[in-house]
């Protein structure tokens, strides 16, 4: 059901209730919490795919959960020349998918209702926002964090769910929640992939058949980098970049290896390998957690913790 403007919002359990006014979804969320329900937020920009539905399913696994899925193409996070107007808007199909998943609340605001006073107040995301994605999209994360903070304030969820595909976004949201004392638990959900390994993304639909075939190089590069990490940080980076640069039509924006908080990576231990590439105007991201298990010995061969020479490739 859709809420009617000018009336108190109505919530029907077991149905998909659609609210466009921030005040309405906020009132319903507060009322449900008072009855003992636990409010779960899944922020999206629509064009829902299996990656989004994995977030929904993770949220629904919480005992007593009522899931709120927001669908809002946020203009603040699109820079000059980016694809705001072209971004897919498939609201009817999205709502049908949410009904099939048993979601009870969809929040579908307009830009006017989210930013009634324009851009008077925004979030400054800090220095990490200038790195990685921020290198080519300098205003992106200010827009992301502003809308996420507004959604958290409007819905006031117990937990909010974000995919690990946009890993830098996830880290910055966690920083914001900690630094601004926002009372919510941020849950990261693993990447969902197509049958051939390509990370699911709403932007995949922009790829032509040749680009779509070439795009599997992203996951192949991450796999190569993860295996090569037994020979150290530089070996992992070289292996990943080598896979990407061998594929015609790919423009590599970055290949980076960081720690789990996106700080400098240690010579051994856990890390996060991140890649970003472009096919024409379509930009794709991917990442994977890796273990850097050894360092190079004096002869250039990887040496494990026991001091023995190891092969840089393992199954």
From Swiss-Prot:
Pathway(s) it belongs to: Cofactor biosynthesis; (R)-pantothenate biosynthesis; (R)-pantothenate from (R)-pantoate and beta-alanine: step 1/1
Active site: 52
Reaction(s) catalysed (UniProt annotation): (R)-pantoate + beta-alanine + ATP = (R)-pantothenate + AMP + diphosphate + H(+)
Residue positions binding ATP: 45-52, 163-166, 192, 200-203
EC code(s) of this entry: 6.3.2.1
Subcellular location field: Cytoplasm
Family: Belongs to the pantothenate synthetase family.
Name of the protein in its database record: Pantothenate synthetase
Species of origin: Mycobacterium ulcerans (strain Agy99)
């Amino acid at each position: 059901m859709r809420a009617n403007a000018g009336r108190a919002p109505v919530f029907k359990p077991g149905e998909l209730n659609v609210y466009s006014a921030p005040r309405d979804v906020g009132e319903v969320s507060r009322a449900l919490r008072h009855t003992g329900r636990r409010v779960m937020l899944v922020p999206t920009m629509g064009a829902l795919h299996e990656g989004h539905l994995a977030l929904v399913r993770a949220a629904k696994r919480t005992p007593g959960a009522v899931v709120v899925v927001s669908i809002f193409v946020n203009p603040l996070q699109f820079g000059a020349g980016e694809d705001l107007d072209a971004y897919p808007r498939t609201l009817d199909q999205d709502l049908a998918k949410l009904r099939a998943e048993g979601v009870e609340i969809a929040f579908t605001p307009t830009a006017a209702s989210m930013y009634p006073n324009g851009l008077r107040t925004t979030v400054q995301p800090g220095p990490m926002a200038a790195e990685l994605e921020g290198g080519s999209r300098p205003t992106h994360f200010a827009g992301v964090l502003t809308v996420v903070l507004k959604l958290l304030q409007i819905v006031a969820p117990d937990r909010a769910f974000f995919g690990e595909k946009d890993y830098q976004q996830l880290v910055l949201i966690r920083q914001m929640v900690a630094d601004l004392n926002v009372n919510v638990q941020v849950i990261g959900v693993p990447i969902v992939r197509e049958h051939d390994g390509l990370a699911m993304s709403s932007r995949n639909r922009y790829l032509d058949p040749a680009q779509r075939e070439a795009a599997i190089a992203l996951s192949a590069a991450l796999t190569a980098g993860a295996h090569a990490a037994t020979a150290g940080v530089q070996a992992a980076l070289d292996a990943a970049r080598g896979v990407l640069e061998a594929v015609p039509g790919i423009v590599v924006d970055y290949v980076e290896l960081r720690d789990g908080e996106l700080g400098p990576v240690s010579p051994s231990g856990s890390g996060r390998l991140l890649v970003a590439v472009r096919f024409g105007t379509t930009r794709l991201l991917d990442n994977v957690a890796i273990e850097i298990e050894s360092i190079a010995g004096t002869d250039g061969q990887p040496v494990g913790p026991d001091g023995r020479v190891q092969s840089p490739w393992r199954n």
